[in-house]
């Protein structure tokens, strides 16, 4: 299916001059600002302050944080029961040596750059964009935007009219600059001793061969190509090959079930899917081709037939003989790709032409096809990577994320390669064959920048520190965290044990929808507070609003929104622009609503507090509660289900499911396992409930609405905080649920 530019004639555009008026505020107290008033966050940051106390504030709930607009009960503290770092003795300063060599070496330099990006975003981003290759430069108008549904359809455009290609800028440009012999990818297999590498010249040749195959089989500019691959080198190769010919790649995490994959195939209607026969992750072998076969059978029943299934023969995991095959549709990758030329003409595209679709969980249960375009995304990922990690040409960079998620798109593939970086790609599990595998890889490739998720940090914390300290790790100079708020104790372990108390941590906040980092420390610029994402990136104006959409200034808690557009912003939800507007721009008119809660302390540091909608963040993966509920009720013995998130010491959040069975069906451990298996099969193992709580009934209002607030309290055992239950149609249900809490 051809995917057109989101900037179609039906979307009217409200133009912006590209100028933002900064407002200087000297007030530290929380006060409400008019929703239409623009202000520069950098003007509100304090460089110096007097310490009133050396003690740490101990926060048990968000209600203990001050807010001029009243407390917002739906929000949770960063990690309940942990100290929020806010006092002088909990500030972590970069070393003088690090700051001296950093791209942004002081608070003053950061503030000057951020102020310029706010005062004149058109000039700021044009200067950066000019460092990349454009076949044709954009026109006089650098960007146009309308983020206010009251003024017309939501629309964002950056560098429209500019003609470029992101694959060319990732590969050809670097080869032409003399980096052809530089290692582009170090690939580390699941098993010890299994590895490979590609230089930028070799990577370009491999990309061109696959691109030529796709073109030869009818894939054209705007066509969707689904990629269901593990972390083989072929995954970034496939992404870049699609980008080279203007095709729109849709990478599906190779842990999603056949049903989830089929949903995505039906939505974007590709004629080609790329996969492999199997993969080994740790000691387990996963038959990916069987999952793809089942998905293609299902999508065919739903009216979408895929013509070609190009399958990589991963001989380390299985054999061809053990791979089910459908002649006429299935093609072995190695049998055909090597026959194609190693050069391929670039398809030049407009900056606003689609680059990729990436499906993310929504609160309604139907996955959302987030659509990113080419030019703005290219500039934003390259720039955020460069500054947030203080990237130098000698760095070796490793991000542990899978390319099935946005982090793998922006910070395994595009962002690093646009900077000519050497990237480590790891196929296996971080604790296989033992919990020291990560640090073995760090030493092997002399990794200097290591970017991972708090879930992995917390998991490795549980093992003896010797698994870390027996490795040198002297090459490390910058650490990074992504996917969810990192709790202060995990931050400190990461800093002290992994980084030997010398590596700054870029604790990044961003989303699939934002394309790149939005709030992040810049190593060398600011002292850090464990658990805080620190300050906004260039061109980003975060605001915290109350339930009525009023901006709150100073120390406060509330809903995190963004004022104004930025180059990396997604442009629409594929095929559903109305849902795009309803989900992200209608809750608070005039702003992009992140769906996250946030607090800001008296120094201006931002603290992300988790989702405020019906989405659970499990190990950095966003999972809609409605998706899990829909999977549970497919079980023949399940009458109804309600899912909430709970704290999990490793995953950040876990999935807690209240299940009502059909009349007369008894509770049993076998049934519990069967329900969990149903979710695994429907969505994937990562969405499996951590707890099934038997529920004779669910707490509902008289209008039939489930009171999830009460379910969250029961799940977290906060029984003294249930609040008013008198509005429930049957208040006795609550007592029944409490009685069954340990069954």
Swiss-Prot record:
Record flagged with keyword Chloroplast: yes
GO annotation, biological process: acetate metabolic process; acetyl-CoA biosynthetic process from acetate; fatty acid metabolic process
Cellular component terms per the entry's GO annotation: chloroplast; chloroplast stroma; cytosol; glyoxysome; plastid
Enzyme class: ligase
Main location, first listed in the record: plastid
Gene3D superfamilies: 3.30.300.30, N-terminal domain of ligase-like
Keywords, comma-separated and alphabetical: ATP-binding, Chloroplast, Fatty acid metabolism, Glyoxysome, Ligase, Lipid metabolism, Nucleotide-binding, Peroxisome, Plastid, Transit peptide
Transit peptide, UniProt annotation: 1-84
Tissue: Expressed in leaves, flower buds and young flowers.
Enzyme Commission number(s): 6.2.1.1
Family annotation (InterPro entries): Ac_CoA_lig, ACAS_N, AMP-bd_C, AMP-bd_C_sf, AMP-binding_CS, AMP-dep_synth/lig_dom, ANL_N_sf
Entry GO MF terms: acetate-CoA ligase activity; AMP binding; ATP binding
Active site: 613
Reactions accelerated catalytically: acetate + ATP + CoA = acetyl-CoA + AMP + diphosphate
Pfam families documented for this protein: ACAS_N (PF16177), AMP-binding (PF00501), AMP-binding_C (PF13193)
Compartment annotation: Plastid, Chloroplast; Glyoxysome
Homology family: Belongs to the ATP-dependent AMP-binding enzyme family.
Function text: Catalyzes the production of acetyl-CoA, an activated form of acetate that can be used for lipid synthesis or for energy generation. May play a limited role in the biosynthesis of lipids.
PANTHER family: ACETYL-COENZYME A SYNTHETASE, ACETYL-COENZYME A SYNTHETASE 1
Name assigned to this protein: Acetyl-coenzyme A synthetase, chloroplastic/glyoxysomal
Classification lineage: Eukaryota, Viridiplantae, Streptophyta, Embryophyta, Tracheophyta
């Amino acid at each position: 299916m051809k995917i057109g530019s989101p900037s179609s004639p039906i979307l009217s555009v409200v133009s912006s001059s590209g100028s933002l008026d900064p407002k200087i505020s000297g007030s530290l107290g929380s006060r409400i600002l008019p929703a239409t008033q623009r202000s520069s966050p950098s003007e509100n940051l304090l460089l110096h302050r007097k310490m009133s106390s050396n003690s740490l504030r101990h926060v048990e709930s968000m209600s203990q944080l001050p807010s001029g607009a009243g407390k917002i009960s739906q929000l949770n503290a960063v990690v309940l029961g942990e100290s929020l770092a806010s006092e002088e003795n909990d500030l972590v300063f970069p070393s003088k040596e690090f700051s001296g060599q950093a791209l942004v070496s002081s608070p003053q330099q950061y503030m000057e750059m951020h102020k310029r990006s706010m005062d004149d975003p058109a000039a700021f981003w044009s200067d950066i964009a000019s460092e990349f290759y454009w076949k044709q430069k954009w026109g006089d108008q650098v960007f146009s935007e309308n983020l206010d549904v009251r003024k017309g359809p939501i629309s964002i455009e950056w560098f429209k009219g500019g003609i470029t290609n992101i694959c060319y800028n990732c590969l050809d440009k670097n080869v032409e600059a003399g980096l052809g012999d530089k290692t582009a990818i170090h690939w580390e297999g699941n098993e010890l001793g299994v590895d490979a590498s590609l230089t930028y010249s070799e990577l370009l040749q491999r990309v061109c061969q696959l691109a030529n195959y796709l073109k030869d089989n009818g894939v054209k500019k705007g066509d969707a190509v689904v990629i269901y691959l593990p972390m083989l080198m072929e995954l970034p190769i496939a992404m870049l090959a699609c980008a080279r010919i203007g095709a729109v790649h849709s990478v599906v995490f190779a842990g999603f079930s056949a049903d989830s994959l089929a949903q995505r195939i039906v939505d974007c209607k590709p004629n080609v899917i790329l996969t492999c026969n199997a993969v080994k992750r740790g000691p387990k072998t996963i038959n990916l081709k069987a999952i793809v076969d089942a998905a293609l059978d299902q999508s065919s029943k739903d009216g979408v037939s895929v013509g070609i299934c190009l399958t990589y023969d991963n001989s380390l995991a299985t054999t061809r003989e053990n791979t089910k095959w459908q002649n006429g549709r299935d093609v072995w990758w190695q049998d055909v790709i090597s026959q194609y030329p190693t050069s391929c003409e670039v398809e030049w595209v407009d900056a606003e032409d689609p680059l990729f679709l990436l499906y993310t969980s929504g609160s309604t249960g139907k996955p959302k096809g987030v659509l990113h375009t080419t030019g703005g995304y290219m500039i934003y990922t390259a720039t955020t990577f460069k500054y947030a990690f203080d990237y130098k040409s000698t760095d070796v960079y490793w991000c542990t994320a899978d390319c099935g998620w946005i982090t793998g798109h922006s910070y395994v593939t595009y962002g690093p390669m646009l900077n000519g970086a050497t990237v480590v790609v790891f196929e296996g599990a971080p604790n296989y064959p033992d919990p020291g595998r990560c640090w073995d890889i760090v030493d092997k490739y002399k990794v200097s920048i290591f970017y991972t998720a708090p879930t992995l940090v917390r998991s490795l914390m549980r093992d003896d520190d010797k698994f870390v300290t027996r490795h040198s790790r002297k090459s490390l100079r910058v650490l990074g965290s992504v996917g969810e708020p990192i709790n202060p104790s995990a931050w400190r372990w990461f800093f002290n044990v992994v980084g030997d108390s010398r590596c700054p941590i870029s604790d990044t906040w961003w989303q699939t929808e934002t394309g790149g980092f939005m709030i992040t420390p810049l190593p060398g610029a600011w002292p850090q507070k464990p658990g805080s994402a620190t300050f906004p990136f260039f061109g980003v104006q975060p605001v915290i609003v109350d339930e009525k959409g009023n901006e709150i200034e100073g120390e406060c808690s509330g809903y995190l929104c963004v004022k104004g557009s930025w180059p990396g912003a997604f442009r629409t939800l594929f095929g559903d622009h109305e849902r795009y507007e309803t989900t992200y721009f209608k809750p608070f008119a005039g702003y992009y609503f992140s769906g996250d809660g946030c607090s800001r302390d008296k120094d201006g540091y931002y603290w992300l507090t988790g989702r405020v909608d019906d989405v659970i963040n499990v190990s950095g993966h966003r999972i809609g509660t409605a998706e899990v509920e829909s999977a549970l009720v497919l079980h023949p013995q399940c009458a109804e289900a309600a899912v909430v998130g709970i704290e999990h010491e490793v995953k950040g959040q876990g999935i807690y499911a209240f299940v009502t069975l059909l009349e007369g069906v008894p509770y049993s451990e076998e049934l519990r396992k069967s329900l969990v298996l149903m979710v695994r099969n429907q969505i994937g193992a990562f969405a499996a409930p951590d707890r099934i709580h038997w529920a004779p009934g669910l707490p509902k209002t008289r209008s039939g609405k489930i009171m999830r607030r009460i379910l969250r309290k029961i799940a977290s055992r906060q029984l003294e905080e249930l609040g008013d239950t008198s509005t429930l149609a049957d208040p006795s249900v609550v007592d029944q649920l409490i009685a069954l809490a340990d069954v």
